[in-house]
Swiss-Prot record:
It is a peripheral membrane protein. PANTHER family: ATPASE SYNTHESIS PROTEIN 25, MITOCHONDRIAL (PTHR28087:SF1). It comes from Candida glabrata (strain ATCC 2001 / BCRC 20586 / JCM 3761 / NBRC 0622 / NRRL Y-65 / CBS 138) (Yeast). Probable mitochondrial mRNA stabilization factor. Belongs to the ATP25 family. GO terms for biological process: mitochondrial gene expression; mRNA stabilization. It comes from the Eukaryota. This is ATPase synthesis protein 25, mitochondrial. Pfam families: mRNA_stabil (PF13929), RsfS (PF02410). Keywords: Membrane, Mitochondrion, Mitochondrion inner membrane, Transit peptide. Residues 1-68 form a transit peptide. GO terms for cellular component: mitochondrial inner membrane.
């Protein structure tokens, strides 16, 4: 009960406390504290105890001094600045002079942005400068540079490139995380990064190096020149407005010198490394290596290796091959092909461009035999390029064009046609067309015996082709042209045999172009009688049936000659009357050809007037 009534710790109780006594007092106590002035009297602090029976007693408490006030403190209302609540205390500027100083510093590091650049570039650069504290920010506009140099593939990577410097690898990593947050919040995309090194992987790398005998007692992290902590490069594809961001440490930025790569042509000189700066940088690196202990012999060996002369080439193998072929160093070229088997697929195209370069620039003659042996012996056995045979034929024709004496057109048959067929490839119509064009244009026989020799090669080539390829209108017309000279002075006796064979083969329905070639050839050689026999009997029509012969082709070949005797012979022999007998449809084109033929032999229209009215209906004239 005494412990219950010790209320000196509660002098201002305004509530009632009900306590149930379990042993001596079997009644409920109601206690209310009364606040008294602070007076040092033993009975100052007391409580009225009222039992259930109604008896009131006064219980004294030990005196105590009140060390607090029951009055509410009177304070002035505090006016809170909404802007200051969100600004940390260490970033608040108490003086206007400091604020102006900060503005001056920001103006000194103002970033120059391209004209008409997107808003995302402004936001990103501002975030890099203000929030991430990245310095030396440069922005290059590759979009406008592409307009001046559209063939430069370096400028097709993106539209804008940002280059900035971070203080350490940790700074690079943290900057990438913050930039990725900005991209996700503002544009809903995630950037793609290259160059990010996992810290766990870096620790494993260092432990692996530490296990080496020579480096076991060495603090590897002292070598800042070879540590990723001091030489890092984060390249980020922002996926927004084709912007690429490069975050580099200072050493890495100096080493890569990306500014010279992306700068316009008129500004490249501003970012070129001077010999003095390169010399200073090399000396600093050498001093850093020398500062290591003598037991770091592996690093010293690496230093010697880095300083020794480069024993490899940075030139592409294809360019090296071209340079050797220009000098006709076939032994060195063969060694290059052995070291780089992938060049065999490009060998023919490289050889063509090299020969054309030699011929056009210097005009020097080439050794066609050595060129042929080198290319033919080094082409791949398994050919996957679909354009290989076209390039190979062009290469052989180029050799023939450079020197037709050492590389004759006759070699096209074994070197190309036979080789292609023996490797399982089908000979196409383009192959025989090209060969026949070579015979007609390049060989160009001038006498009968030259024509016989050329025709022998034609027959040998035709034997390699299938009938489906040969018996086409375009091929047959070219074959017939090879039976005569271009001057129309000589023709082979087999010319007439070929005509008989074609009449038998096509059953009087010879293809149009082939028939036109035959008719023109007969007219050029003055074979008028054979021409009439061919037209009236060999490819004639059956009496009583419809005439389906190509009259337009026949009359066109005749009227183009302007030969009065030939046209008069055809009219007087009654050949044109077959148009009426065979019920040929006379359209306006055929009517014009008939009028031209009659006008050539009868300008005044007096002799063949009746025949003209019979053959040309009035309906065709009105049309």
């Amino acid at each position: 009960m005494q412990s219950l009534l010790q209320l000196k710790h509660y002098p201002l109780l305004t509530s009632y406390l009900e306590v149930l006594s379990t042993q001596k007092l079997h009644y409920m106590l109601r206690i209310r504290s009364i606040a008294r002035p602070i007076v040092r009297r033993p009975w100052a602090n007391a409580a009225r105890v009222t039992g259930i029976s109604g008896t009131r007693i006064q219980v004294p408490f030990p005196s105590s001094v009140r060390w607090y006030s029951d009055r509410e403190p009177q304070t002035e209302p505090v006016v809170k600045d909404e802007e200051s609540e969100h600004v940390p205390w260490y970033m608040r500027l108490e003086d206007d002079s400091l604020k102006s100083l900060n503005e001056d510093i920001s103006k000194q590091h103002e970033v120059r942005l391209p004209d008409d650049c997107p808003d995302s570039l402004h936001i990103l650069v501002k975030h890099l400068q203000k929030q991430l504290a990245l310095r030396d920010i440069l922005v290059f506009d590759l979009k406008n540079q592409r307009l001046a140099d559209p063939e430069n593939y370096r400028l097709k990577m993106c539209d804008y490139v940002i280059i900035c410097t971070a203080m350490s690898t940790k700074h690079c990593e943290r900057s990438y995380v913050e930039i990725n947050k900005l991209l996700k919040n503002e544009y809903g995309v995630s950037g793609y990064v290259e160059g990010q090194v996992n810290p766990n992987d870096e620790k494993k790398r260092l432990k692996r190096l530490a296990r080496k005998n020579n480096l076991g007692r060495t603090n590897i992290r002292r070598n800042a020149l070879n540590s990723t902590e001091e030489s890092s490069w984060y390249m980020i594809d922002c996926h927004v407005d084709s912007i690429f961001l490069n975050i580099l440490t200072e050493n890495r930025r100096y080493e890569m010198n990306l500014e010279e790569l992306y700068a316009p042509l008129n500004e490249k000189h501003l970012y070129e490394k001077s010999e003095h700066s390169m010399h200073i940088n090399t000396n600093n690196r050498s001093q850093a290596f020398d500062s290591l202990e003598e037991e770091d012999n592996v690093l010293l060996a690496l230093r010697k290796l880095a300083q020794q002369k480069r024993q490899y080439s940075t030139e592409s193998p294809a360019r090296s091959l071209r340079n050797e072929l220009v000098k006709e160093n076939f032994d060195s070229s063969k060694k290059l092909l052995a070291d780089n088997p992938e060049l065999r697929e490009q060998l023919v195209k490289v050889a063509i461009s090299t020969i054309e370069q030699i011929r056009d620039s210097t005009g020097a003659s080439i050794n066609t035999e050595k060129w042929y042996k080198f290319v033919s012996h080094n082409v791949p056995l398994v050919i996957q390029d679909t354009t290989f045979w076209d390039s190979y034929l062009k290469f052989l024709l180029l050799l023939n064009d450079c020197n037709s004496q050492t590389y004759s057109y006759k070699r096209l048959i074994p070197d190309y046609l036979v080789t292609k067929r023996s490797m399982g490839e089908e000979l196409t119509a383009d192959d025989i067309t090209t060969f026949l064009s070579v015979i007609s244009e390049r060989v160009n026989p001038q006498n009968y015996w030259d024509l016989v020799k050329a025709n022998t090669q034609v027959v040998e080539a035709l034997r390699l082709f299938d009938e489906e390829v040969i018996f086409t209108d375009a091929i047959l017309s070219k074959v017939i042209k090879t039976l005569t000279t271009n001057s129309n002075e000589h023709k082979l006796h087999s010319f007439y045999e070929v005509i008989k064979f074609l009449v038998w083969k096509y059953e009087k329905e010879i293809p149009i172009n082939t028939l036109e070639t035959i008719l023109k050839t007969l007219i050029n050689f003055g074979e008028y009688d054979y021409l009439l026999r061919l037209w009236t009997t060999k490819i004639g029509y059956n009496v009583g049936s419809k005439d389906t012969r190509p009259w337009k082709v026949f009359l066109k070949a005749i009227t183009e000659t302007q030969d009065v005797e030939l046209i008069r012979l055809i009219i007087e022999k009654g050949c044109l009357l077959d148009i009426s007998r065979g019920k040929v449809d006379v359209d306006p084109q055929l009517a014009v050809l008939l009028k031209t033929a009659f006008k050539t032999v009868d300008p005044e229209n007096l002799i063949y007037n009746d025949q003209q009215r019979l053959l040309i209906p009035s309906s065709a004239t009105r049309q």
